[in-house]
């Protein structure tokens, strides 16, 4: 809300009243500022005077403290002066007079005193020589005149010395009973205090309330105020410094350090604050002068200006009411009022010219004299532009009417063409939508027509066809690959079963060998036991030798058969290992193919985003075309919907691919584990074969020994000792054979267990390959797709070329 709304109407309608209100307001502000300034100056002057007095008081107290210190030092120096000590008695007074001249002007007397007799032996005042100093009742401070060593200085309070108030400084000469007394005039010291304010004076008061130093002799030794109960004394001794006002006096107090004295500086408040009254009077005079000047300004200038402004206000109201011919008198005034009246006359002439030109333009009288006059400013430029525009518009109106019909016809033709274009785009968008829906349902055999008049739609169709071609080829390769994996897994399973059966046969053979070896060992032991009866049972030995020879031949045959079967098992394990390696490579290739499918789906997402941008561009074109672009708007909505559905379809495909990739990853992991187990089984079988070879060798050796025994049966009667030795050897070999046969049996059982685990892993791989093939069966592809042969041409970049190369490599591997 404007400030003027709070001003009464009677004031707002009169400039004189406004001026009066402003002047009164200014006067009130001046008075307020003056009062504030007076108070501020008064406070500032008061604080300044207080500060000056306090500073002076503190400085005087410090100076007095320094003066006392100097006098103590001087007294101590005099007590140690050899000239005074060594001077003859008759010359001591002269020496003292010489020394006192070097002291300050306050020094009133210098005495040389004998403390034993209390006698003044020499003095600068000859009248007191021979007197006792106790006759002056010197009020020594502290414990009296008691020296504790050379160099001590004792001071006194104020006392009267021959009519002069003084204070004494005393110091004892080292090694004697003599001392030096110096009397200082406190009146002279009081006259040294400054008097920077008229009527001011300074006094030094001790703790008892007695004036010790003052310029007024009558005040010295008198009680100050209420004596020791005076508040200013207590305050001065407890605080360092301060200012107080009492009895019309401004009193500054400061403690004299090292003493029990307070220095008090007094100044009459009327004199101390005299500057405050002068400043206040000057400010009042300034305010009165300013108010009087403002009043004179209103009377002299306001009345004349108000009359002229009232007249000009009436003329302005007439012009505002439309009376632009109202009389405005000329004036000879050269001030602002005269300039204002002349400006009003110029405005009147300006408005008259503008009105004449407006009338001529309204009547379309382009030859009127008023139009020849110049009208300055933007209004003149607008009138001139209006003149030429109106004249040109009238000339162009007929031409516009002729072209309007032609424009209408062209607009109708454009609308028909736009509708046809919208219909074509809508049809193509529907085809794209159906194709993408089929692809989302798994049918990858659908293709779009690329023969269209619209480059953008043709590019989209070409890109989508290329995408579907690559996706179909990839799915086809994965289907074939998963089928090959399943077939390879079945073949590996069959081979593993054969290996398992062979291993079982090997295990049985080894167990038979172990049983024969144990039986052979028992026979050999029996032979060894019966050797003591060999002479009586030679025929039984021969029979046993024949039986042992037969068993040994059987063991050799079984060992050779086991060796052959073990070699077959190794060859079969090698074949299984090679097949497992090929299967692992194929599963890893399948994992790479699934990664490529994921990248293709990403490409589909990019195309969907481009489709969204195409829909946005179509919407913009439709907005520009207005009603003729309604078809574009419909097509844009369809394309936008198609883009959204494509995105959803790619998300479903991504989910399906993720499941397939998980299955593929598990299959690859299982195959790798199976490969590790096959390697372990291969090592076990190799160890078993080596053990069997050793067993066969041992059996052949045992068989040779048995045949030797059988051949030498006829000679046993004569060579019993040789037979015993050979039987022992056969027994040792039989023990080794038995142990190795048992090891071979255990190894064969372990091999059988490993082959069982391998068979189970292969069966799991076959099941996972079957699941993968079933997942991929959701996609419909062409059996004769070119990509399956590794010869597909594509234009999607290095990624698709890499996929084709990998497929060709896989195809070559399978052909091999």
Curated annotation (Swiss-Prot):
Superkingdom in the source lineage: Archaea
Q: Where is this region: Disordered?
A: 399-425, 790-816
Q: Could you describe the post-translational modifications of this protein? A: Methylated by CheR.
Here the segments flagged for biased composition (Basic and acidic residues) are: 405-418, 804-816
Q: Please give the Pfam families that the UniProt record associates with this protein.
A: HAMP, MCPsignal
One GO cellular-component annotation of the UniProt record comes to: plasma membrane
Q: Which residues form the Methyl-accepting transducer domain?
A: 495-731
Q: Which GO terms describe its biological process?
A: chemotaxis; signal transduction
Keywords per UniProt: Cell membrane, Chemotaxis, Membrane, Repeat, Transducer, Transmembrane, Transmembrane helix
Q: What does this protein do?
A: Potentially involved in chemo- or phototactic signal transduction.
Q: Which family does it belong to?
A: Belongs to the methyl-accepting chemotaxis (MCP) protein family.
Q: What is this protein's name?
A: Transducer protein Htr18
Q: What is the name of the gene encoding this protein?
A: htr18
